[in-house]
Amino acid sequence: MVAISEFGLKIKNIEASTLFEYNIGVRDHYEYKDAMFTNSLFKDFLEENGLETYKGESTRDIICLEFHYGSRSYQQELEHLYKVATTAQKEYNKARIKNDKFLLEKAKNKQNKIKELLLFARKNRLKYQQLTKEQLRTKFYNEGVEVEYITRKRNGEIKKRETIRYKMLFRSTGKAKKGSCMFIRDELYEKAKDFLYMGIQLPEENAPLVEVSAYAPLVASGIVGRVKIDPKNILILKDVDRYFKTNIVSIETDENKQCIAKFIEDYELKNTLFDGQALIDTSIFPEWGNGYILLRHHFCKMAAFHANIQMFFKDYFGDKYETATVTDMFGNEHYVKDIELITTDNAVKWLKMDVSYDAWCEKVYENNCMFGIVKTAHESKLGNVQKMSYQMVNSLDIDIMEDVIKESALYVERLKTDDECFFDYLKKHSNFSNDHEVLLALCEHNPEFVRSSYFRARRSDIIKAYTLKMKSGELIQIADNLTVVGSPYAMLLYAATGKEESVDEDDTFFFEEGTIQCYTERFNSDEYLAFFRSPFNSKNNLTYLHNMYSKKMEKYFKFGKNIVAVNMIGTPFQDRNNGLVYGSV
């Protein structure tokens, strides 16, 4: 078992409605679960600035609140308890009919507890306050909240009471989806807020609250590692847009407000070539990284792909390499020999907050230039194959279904006839609720067990269950989940010159009628590939790719088998894939 402290600090995740009712005296406890304050640059900062921990494993200085329910009025509490009492009476009657002493005792205890709760509710009827979950959220956000911690002796006697007051700190995008929010101890609030906001002072009126709420928590993203990058060695360029014309089907509404599909010829589309991506030099790319790393810092997020930046610059500039310079979007000159990372303005959100380049660099220097690594690419647990979804299957023509199901049909046949294949399936799909590990252990203990009637019956049942899943759309294909990078060689050319027109000199990809050229080591050169966006919304997200190897791609990029580079110049790749974001940033 891996200790939780390896991934962060244990904190309390409290249901806000129960905490409110506890604080006003109408509950004897509040509901909570264990959660984790994950490793992050923000956690590093707090630990250096007064965060108190217990044995380096947990902290009370940070809590998470969830707002799933509102608080009850006295009448609502009575109705709830009467409903529970009715259910408890039914359980008691069933236990009495069965004459089960254990169930009878359990039912009696439940009824006695409900009686205690009814007496408690009547005694405190004037204390109840009915608030919706939205009202509770507003109250806690504006006023903060107190949490009482009780330490008990082994016999249950109260040893110590401690009350800590918290203020609302932030909601990350992930937390916002769940309706939860991070709160911090009062004494740490100002330091923590100043760190998250980079010291940005918001105006009293028309403050960009939505933007700040989205970008400030980036530095609090959970990380799996760190990489040191001098901000002055980061080349930030203005992103490049490329326009082209193609035929499209536009979904519109007519005068009767009915949805119609309208065919339009020579419609102008736009590709933002490097949106949210970066190239990182091999000299600082971590050894454990695989093709790319997802980076976070103050108001900054980017997918940084493994490249031989300095090798390219040496080849490009030749004898002038030592003195060659390029100018960034702020007018700063950089020696190309010093550049460790290349990105664009779309990756640095501090520009939207009117923060200067120098001010951001100073903030990066404050934590010794350490960038957080959120994730990297990794191999699929299914190996050489991947499962399709029913949406993917439904997007394909029925005429080709025989080819679509071919791999799955062959696999089912192998499960029936190949013991090693079946054992491998058991290993990959074993969990605490099935008997796969037991079957494997019995076969290992006695190989002849595979001939037993019990094993044959279980094998048949397991394969039948798998075929049912297969029929629901989970067909397997020789495929993989790949991370997308857009026209990376064009990005190198742009970095060498600082001129937008240089991207058009990219000769690693060319326009090809009916398909889009790409480069990935996962498949062979000159193979044609079906690209399904994830999540896959409709057949419009299906793209036909042509895998093309080139010496330049092999020389200047170390992507491995989990990255696919796609031609973004003059192709509808972004629009066909709903404005797909590179590297899942």
Outline where the language-model segments fall.
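Core mixed alpha/beta domains of very large multi-subunit molecular machines
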Residues: 1-584
